């Protein structure tokens, strides 16, 4: 876990091994089982393929359903650096997360003073279970803007025409109702 120190993790594994097992349940198999299955089916690997070093090159980062300040505090420094590099950060979550709205860098004296740095350029407060509708809305907005890399899509994806067809079956009013986010905000995120 991003909240656990190396020392605590070491003690945890010593404790668990006293019960005769080397199986150490953690967030990777308790919280991310469904995401691992979905990623395996979608991109053929059940884990993230992005490293924090990739943030340095990003023009936009979407933090979806994640609370980095609470669960992955080491990620906040990388997000802060990405923002300094000109990256736009969109935070999507049912609740605002303090680390994304007033980050105070603990290793910089000036970072501890004041009210903190707002990392998220845009916060979309999605309704619980409305994330799929929101992502469909973002996809609809990107599709209608024409901001697509057709060469990449043709070369590396399967089923894009079916995906577009499924998006066309969804109305903006349904997206807004199910996600709890306005069409204007969704288009701004796209």
Give, region by region, the residue ranges found by the protein language model.
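Cofactor-pocket helix-loop regions in the catalytic cores of large enzyme subunits
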Residues: 1-190
């Amino acid at each position: 876990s991003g909240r656990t120190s190396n020392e605590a993790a070491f003690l945890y594994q010593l404790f668990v091994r006293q019960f005769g097992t080397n199986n150490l349940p953690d967030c990777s198999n308790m919280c991310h089982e469904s995401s691992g299955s979905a990623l395996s089916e979608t991109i053929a690997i059940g884990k993230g393929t992005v490293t924090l070093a990739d943030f340095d090159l990003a023009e936009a980062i979407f933090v979806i359903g994640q609370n980095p300040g609470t669960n992955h505090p080491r990620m906040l420094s990388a997000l802060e650096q990405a923002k300094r590099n000109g990256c736009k950060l969109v935070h999507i979550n049912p609740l605002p997360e303090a680390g994304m709205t007033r980050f105070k860098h603990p290793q910089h004296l000036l970072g501890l003073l004041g009210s903190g740095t707002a990392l998220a350029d845009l916060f979309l407060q999605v309704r619980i279970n409305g994330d799929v509708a929101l992502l469909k809305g973002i996809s609809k907005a990107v599709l209608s803007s024409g901001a697509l890399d057709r060469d990449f899509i043709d070369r590396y994806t399967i089923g894009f025409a079916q995906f577009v067809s499924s998006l066309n079956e969804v109305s903006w009013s349904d997206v807004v109702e199910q996600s709890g986010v306005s069409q204007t905000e969704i288009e701004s995120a796209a």
